[in-house]
A protein has these predicted regions:
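Membrane-interface amphipathic/re-entrant loop segments adjacent to transmembrane helices
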Residues: 194-202, 295, 329, 497, ...
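Binuclear metal-dependent hydrolase catalytic cores
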Residues: 686, 690, 698-704, 708-786, ...
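Hydrophobic alpha-helical transmembrane segments in multi-pass membrane proteins
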Residues: 3, 52, 57, 320-534, ...
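Membrane-interface helix/helix-cap signal primarily in integral membrane proteins
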Residues: 2-12, 70-334, 697-704, 710, ...
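Core dinuclear metal-dependent hydrolase active-site scaffold
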Residues: 316, 413-423, 441-442, 446-449, ...
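Transmembrane alpha-helices and immediately adjacent membrane-cytoplasm interface residues
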Residues: 53-87, 644-650
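Di-metal (Zn2+ and/or Mg2+/Mn2+) metal-binding site signature of metallo-dependent hydrolases
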Residues: 332-353, 710-734, 845-859
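Cap/insert and terminal regions of metallo-dependent hydrolase folds
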Residues: 738, 830-904
Length: 953
């Protein structure tokens, strides 16, 4: 009798069904509304790979999917209001606070003790409300109950329209907020805004807040929370409960209005994933001296205890920026973002409940499989976690996939036998993933632009594509074994257990690497930085999944049941690995340099190419050769990956000089670019915030867009925060030949006062990296290329500038002035420059001191005679820059004025193609090139009109 041949393994990645191709085309169609070229390129890729789209009927269906997606994408674009209520117009002109009230529709805790509140129907009493929602960021709130959804809030706020940073090729927080329907923003600190709440919160929000307070009370140190014994008396238990929870009417009775103080100014600008920033204020919080046992509502845990509320509720109020940066540098940020990994604890809970059911009614398993019961019981638990964690996109994705699997696999077991086969279709992982994507897109088409959604789906897809390769590598390796060997005595149980443990470590590390690789293009595109420390996931993820999360949920259940002592015991046990993690990361930072590395940001074609090649390689597993579709994917991926380098080569040889004044808020950062890859930064911007680094989060993203982190040099006109702070990150992470400054007080001239802290930090970074720093003065010339140079016009030799005065640069081409960069030079300094007789003529004038009246010298405008002027000033800045006097002086001379706060990044190009046929494209003897203006966005008329006519700053 012939032996039966074993079945060959089934390839894990099957061809997509046509409806799945339609889903991908529909999604690409939605993206077409905002990014037409990348989306249509993706559509062409799908159509070329899937041969079915060349059939007439399928081609029509595919086109219909794309058109339907485009139509939905266009209809979903938020309509930004163009007209504001009269009371807001008056407030924007006067820069004064206005008393408003609104309904709370959402709130969440942010790091550094910030509470973000989303308000609707905002406006003064009996006046027209704002057209849209408003985001209020409240830092260091006093010890009062948190404002909750459903309540009304009254506050004295300086409201302004949402405005982000508009720079070519970078993210913009403005688009993020507009997708949420938020068009206005405000900030408050402590009790400065006299915030008062009234009304009763929604039942769900109130219950969630009560649970959060119970967990916070249980996480307090034993001497503060009353957890002194494991068997407290009833009196102690009740007292502890009363100390941890607000009274029944705590949310319905508004506290007495706090004392009014000077309102904090809005920050110059806001960021994205760091989306809102509060200006630093001197002085300690007003509630810092309050005894610990009286701080019932705003309990803030230090260290690892702040991680547990983030895992349970998505509340990061107690975390601080240094710890968050260390977690990010270690590649562990995803472990705090509620997702499928956290939802796995729901499976453990469902498994425990199934075991209890089996003990109470074992006969149930004769009719209903245990695995189906586990799946069905996990659904209500997952829904509860969605509500508890405030439903972030990654958790919604995981819950949807769980629900789809249960619907397709477990629900048919509830039906009679004759219906099960027909109602239990075969499905693959791709089916589940695309169904979840379709559900989320139909509910909110704009979720496709959410970075969290993109990272979540990319990570899961990457794990699914790499898992077969991980299994194959393991099975072909020396540590693989068969359970049959254990039963036959060929392998000891201890060795088998060790093999299973090593396999678990292998899969954990492999899945972590797969998720990192799958999300790497998106991470680099969004942040321009990555980490090599992701192997720490090998230690942290098992501890998180098997210790921290289960104990945290058990502690939450105990706290909800009123078992304070048991809750405190469980939560403090869960806190041990969290504390160990933070201590380990601090040690690594101190001894091993726990830092992110800066890398080039890929062109968008590289993201598509990377995905195409990853799918093609996954299609090769368990096949003798690449299928036809995989070959097309490999060809497409290779072509797409080559686009970015080809564009870089084109830009390298392009005969063009560029001056780009970046949108960095109330600051200044100028990027100079010239042929053959020459680049230099003159100033780098800088804000008050310690969370949002202009150099790291704005300037670096511009510099690494399809380019290397490299500069020829950096120059600082003067060491003020809004010019120098952004260069600290650039100096610490970029390759460069030199740095140029004016003589620095206290460093180059020790007889002066002590040096500024930023100057000390800057020179220390340069010294540690071996970058030479040169001091410049009038008469120095920095050659950039043949015929192109940066002249130094001030300070005079032997003069150490002080205050806002510093270096004055003039960009020249064969003696023709292209641009004048005077920094923040004040009027007396500029008059001295005029008296020196230096040639100041230039096509472009970057206004001194952001257009301040203190730097207004009309004779300078006459001497420069520019074709256009640029003011680097933030929108709605508190200094009302550029001033009305400067605007009038420029208008009288017919000099066009462009403002970065209104128009975003402003780039001026000088095209040298007329000389391209010559050996030296910058040689003399040709007419000087004409400047061409490139604006990132259309001018914002409302911001331009925000300064009143009577302003004389």
């Amino acid at each position: 009798m012939p032996t039966k041949q074993p079945m060959p393994p089934v390839p894990p990645l099957q061809p997509l069904l046509f409806w799945e191709t339609g889903v991908l085309l529909f999604v690409a169609g939605i993206v077409t509304a905002r990014f037409p070229v990348p989306a249509l390129t993706a559509c062409a890729l799908f159509a070329w790979v899937d041969s079915r789209t060349r059939r007439p009927l399928c081609c029509l269906l595919a086109a219909a999917c794309v058109i339907a997606g485009w139509w939905i994408g266009e209809k979903s674009v938020p309509r930004v209001p163009q007209e504001y209520p009269a009371w807001l117009e008056k407030s924007l002109s006067s820069r004064r606070a206005v008393t408003v009230e609104g309904v709370i529709v959402g709130s969440r805790g942010l790091p550094d003790q910030r509470l973000q509140i989303i308000l609707d129907d905002v406006g003064p009493a009996e006046k027209e409300p704002l057209p849209g929602r408003m985001a209020l960021t409240w830092q260091d709130m006093p010890d009062v109950p948190r404002p909750l959804p459903g309540q009304r809030i009254t506050a004295d706020l300086k409201i302004r329209p949402v405005h982000g940073f508009h720079n070519q090729g970078t993210w913009n927080s403005e688009a993020y907020w507009h997708r949420q329907g938020v068009f206005f923003q405000a900030w408050a600190k402590q009790d400065d805004a006299a915030i008062r709440t009234s009304g009763t919160p929604s039942a769900g929000a109130e219950l969630r807040e009560r649970l959060r307070l119970r967990v916070a009370a249980a996480l307090d140190p034993p001497e503060e929370s009353g957890l002194r014994t494991l068997s407290p008396s009833s009196t102690d238990r009740n007292a502890s409960r009363q100390a941890a929870l607000p009274s029944q009417n705590a949310w319905s009775e508004p506290p007495s209005p706090p004392r009014r103080e000077k309102l904090p100014s809005a920050p110059e600008q806001i960021g994205e994933v760091q989306t809102e920033e509060v200006r630093e204020h001197s002085g300690s919080p007003a509630h810092s001296a309050a005894p610990a046992d009286t701080r019932r509502f705003s309990r803030v845990q230090d260290g690892g205890a702040s991680i547990i509320p983030a895992l349970l509720f998505g509340d990061r109020y107690g975390l601080n920026t240094p710890d968050m940066e260390r977690i990010n540098a270690a590649g562990l940020t995803h472990s705090l973002a509620l997702s499928g990994q956290h939802l796995a604890v729901v499976g453990l809970g469902a498994l425990a409940l199934t075991g209890i059911v089996g003990l109470l009614a074992p006969g149930l398993f004769l009719r209903f499989p245990a695995y189906s019961l586990i799946g069905l019981l996990s659904l209500p638990l997952a829904s509860a976690y969605l509500w508890l964690g405030d439903a972030p996109p990654s958790l919604v994705r995981a819950a949807l996939m769980l629900a789809i699997v249960c619907l397709l696999r477990c629900v048919p077991d509830l039906l009679p036998e004759r219906f099960r086969r027909n109602l239990r279709p075969a499905f693959t992982f791709a089916d589940v993933l695309l169904l979840a994507l379709l559900c989320m897109v139909l509910a909110d088409p704009l979720c496709l632009y959410d970075l969290g959604v993109q990272l979540s789906f990319s990570a899961v897809a990457g794990i699914a594509l790499c898992s077969p390769w991980l299994s194959k590598l393991w099975n072909d390796g020396p540590l693989s074994f068969s359970p049959l060997k254990v039963l036959q005595g060929g392998l000891s149980p201890m060795r088998a257990a060790g093999g299973r443990f090593i396999r678990l470590l292998w899969l954990t590390l492999g899945c972590s690497v797969a998720a990192q690789l799958a999300t790497l293009p998106l991470v680099l595109d969004a942040f321009g930085r990555s980490t090599l420390w992701f192997p720490i996931n090998l230690l942290w993820l098992p501890a998180l999944g098997f210790i921290v999360l289960p104990l945290s949920f058990l502690g939450l259940i105990a706290a909800a049941a009123g078992l304070e002592q048991a809750a405190g015991f469980l939560l403090h046990l869960a806190n041990i690995p969290c504390e160990a993690l933070l201590h380990s990361l601090r040690w690594l930072q101190a001894h091993a340099g726990l830092d992110l590395f800066v890398s080039p940001r890929p062109h968008w074609t590289a993201i598509l190419g990377f995905g195409a090649i990853a799918v093609a390689l996954a299609m090769r597993i368990h096949r003798d050769h690449f299928p036809h579709a995989a070959k097309r994917l490999l060809i497409s991926g290779a072509l797409l990956l080559s686009v970015g380098p080809l564009l870089w080569v084109h830009a390298f040889f392009e005969p063009k000089i560029s001056l780009r004044v970046l949108d960095v808020g109330q600051g200044q950062a100028v990027l100079l670019e010239w042929p053959y890859g020459g680049r230099a930064m003159v100033d780098g911007g800088g804000l008050f915030s310690d969370r949002f680094d202009v150099g790291r989060d704005l300037v670096s993203l511009v510099l690494t867009a399809n380019n290397l982190p490299r500069l020829d040099f950096i120059a600082v006109t003067h060491p003020d925060r809004d010019h120098l702070k952004g260069l600290l990150f650039i100096a610490a992470n970029y390759a460069m030949k030199a740095a140029y400054t004016a003589p620095l007080e206290g460093i180059d001239t020790p007889q002066h006062d002590s040096p500024r802290p930023l100057s000390e930090a800057f020179t220390a970074i340069l010294a540690s990296r071996g970058i030479p720093r040169h001091t410049l003065g009038a008469g120095n010339v920095l050659p950039l290329a043949d015929g192109l140079a940066l002249e130094v016009l001030a300070p005079a030799p032997g003069v150490t500038p002080s205050g806002n005065d510093g270096l004055v640069f003039r960009l020249v081409l064969n003696g023709h002035g292209l641009a004048l960069l005077p920094g923040d030079a004040e009027a007396p300094y500029l008059r001295a420059l005029l008296r020196s007789g230096a040639d100041l003529s230039a096509d472009v004038l970057v206004l001194p001191h952001h257009g301040s009246a203190g730097s207004l010298v009309p004779a300078l405008y006459d001497a420069v005679s520019p074709k256009l002027a640029i003011a680097s000033a933030g929108a709605y800045n508190p200094y009302r820059l550029p001033s009305r006097k400067v605007r009038d002086a420029l208008e009288w001379r017919d000099i066009p004025l462009h403002i970065t706060g209104n128009e975003g990044e402003i780039a001026v190009h000088w095209d040298l193609k007329k000389n391209a046929g010559k050996k030296n494209i910058l040689q003399e003897g040709f007419p000087p090139p004409r400047p061409h203006l490139s604006q990132y966005v259309q001018p914002m008329g409302r911001a331009r009109e925000s300064s009143p006519a009577g302003n004389t700053e």
